[in-house]
Design a protein with these regions (language model features):
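A short, N-terminal "cap"/entry segment at the start of jelly-roll beta-barrel domains
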Residues: 1-36, 81-86, 138-140
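Double-stranded beta-helix
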Residues: 11, 78, 103-140
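Short acidic-glycine-tyrosine-enriched beta hairpin
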Residues: 74-99
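Conserved short histidine dyad/triad with adjacent acidic residue
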Residues: 40-57
Length: 140
């Protein structure tokens, strides 16, 4: 059985604070080529998630700790939707449709969420990274 414990979250928070990217993740899947990717992402408010999309793949985000805003964009870079997420808040889980431009802004140190999506993992290709910047921590 796999678990994400309070101790694991504490270790992830320390690691994310020390990481130059200001975030880290804890994989529940065994291999990067697993058919379903399952990971806990822990980050700090100054981490930058580039605006991206997953071609042909949905993404499920489930809040665990802290708070964030999920931004959904139109193809021209305008904001289509902004969803605030936090444990105990109105929105805890969001399924982002395939091919949807999005990014996250974290509001609290040690914000954690689970991400589930179809694998295998592959780095973003140019068609999956937006040609616009979107909302960034300094613009929020």
């Amino acid at each position: 059985m796999k678990k994400i414990t309070a101790g694991i979250l504490a270790d992830l928070q320390k690691a994310s604070a020390e990481n130059p990217r200001r975030r880290t993740n804890y994989n529940l899947h065994e291999q990067l080529d697993d058919p379903i990717q399952r990971l806990c992402i822990m980050g700090e408010p100054d981490t930058v998630f580039p605006v991206h999309r997953h071609l042909g793949k949905w993404e499920l985000a489930c809040m665990m700790k802290g708070s964030l805003t999920l931004y959904i964009y139109n193809d021209d870079g305008s904001i289509r939707e902004q969803i605030d997420m936090a444990p105990g808040g109105d929105t805890l889980v969001v399924e982002i449709p395939a091919d949807t431009w999005h990014n996250y802004i974290l509001h609290e140190p040690g914000t954690a969420f689970m991400e589930v999506k179809r694998g295998p993992y592959k780095p973003f290709g140019p068609e999956e990274l937006a040609g616009f910047k979107g909302v960034t921590p300094e613009k929020h």
